[in-house]
């Protein structure tokens, strides 16, 4: 929005002929790096400014977190802490993105739309848990249906409304590989890939959101790495130099990712231990959906496990736990567990680690994964 008013209108109308430093200075609005930086700052400030009123309103509405009985006493003390704070993240991301991005990018609106749809699924889940007093929220089939519909819409827009490249960019390889165009593999097969990515990423972040500051801090790190990747993919010189799939449409996704960075950092201000608010499913599903959607749009699908390595580890720990329990129950008659409790952060907690230590160590691991994802740009 600001791009059109301050650059397209004021600068182009008055900047070239005016001697005013104000009008000439508006030239900076054409640069995606400038707009990304300010989208980050704007989202951060919105989250910080509105955080306290939102938390207070959630508390007044008695939108408190329910804690499962089997969790530790440390977790039981958090019962009643306001949840659904993810609306603060999503709202600040939407406002700052609309303010600072060019609004003629269909990829930008696709990322925003997918994020909002995943947020809607999470909101419904939280609402049923809290207001309807149904502890499990949406049924598994209902939640899956919402996620599948969103994935189908993402694929549909890519197929019918864009010139999206149906190729997969493989890390560590010089050439873009595995063509999946119509002549080789129909794009309908790519739909399965999109479903796998979006459902996997959204649920992985959802599983990670179990400790004060954990999901928000890991999101900040993962989104910072994804911001850098979207920028180099959008710049022809960097893309050619690093042998990436060049996608100029992803430039505005950089602004979107920057807004996510700022919003997650601002939310961490209130979510750091001891947490004053939790993001809830409305936040975690939306963040995971945003990560997956941007990875798909920028052809970084295979880098997503590195970008969000902690999220993947948490999800895999649950898969291992459930699979092993079912297998041993079927074969031995008694279900056995690999971990004391899944996701993995609960295993360490029951092992005697204090929550802040677990969070800080997971943050260190997230930083290492982010650096690894960025290093692949040169390892081709």
Segments the model singles out, each with a brief description of its role:
Residues 2-53, 93-120, 154, 158-175, ...:
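Alpha-helical transmembrane segments
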Residues 52-70:
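Membrane-interface helix-loop junction between the first two transmembrane segments
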Residues 78-90, 142-150, 253, 355-365:
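Select subsegments of transmembrane alpha-helices in polytopic membrane proteins
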